[in-house]
Amino acid sequence: LFDDVVARELKDEDRIVAKNKHWVAFVPYAARYPFEIHVAPVMPVADLAGLSPEQSDAFPEIALEVMRRLDGVFGIAMAYIATWHQAPVREGRDLLRLHWQITSVRRAPGKLKYLAGSESAMGAFIMDLKPEQSAGQLRDVVL
């Protein structure tokens, strides 16, 4: 499924924040936070150990660009949580693909995203911006 998501993001380009030859960073279609970004290898990889030397070498470039864009969108250092997602070790390795998820609770300068009842109780997140708008703001940051 995630392979299809990445392929669609590369095709549409509306939600892409940054990309290089080996990685793509995008605001997911069903983002839960205004500035949630997923960074994934362009070619499917199950886990960090499966990265090629070229993919490993290209990661810092896109990671730094994403962090600069997050900091630049409001002109302040953006607080964030970063998580690596990898495939299970033994069974089901085809069920998940490696990607790095960055989430910020900030939704505007001086404003945090607090979960409403529907979000915390039911997991039905309400967004302040469309993911395409968030991605556009991040792309517009002058580096």
Regions of interest found by a model, annotated:
Residues 1-143:
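HIT superfamily nucleotide-processing domains
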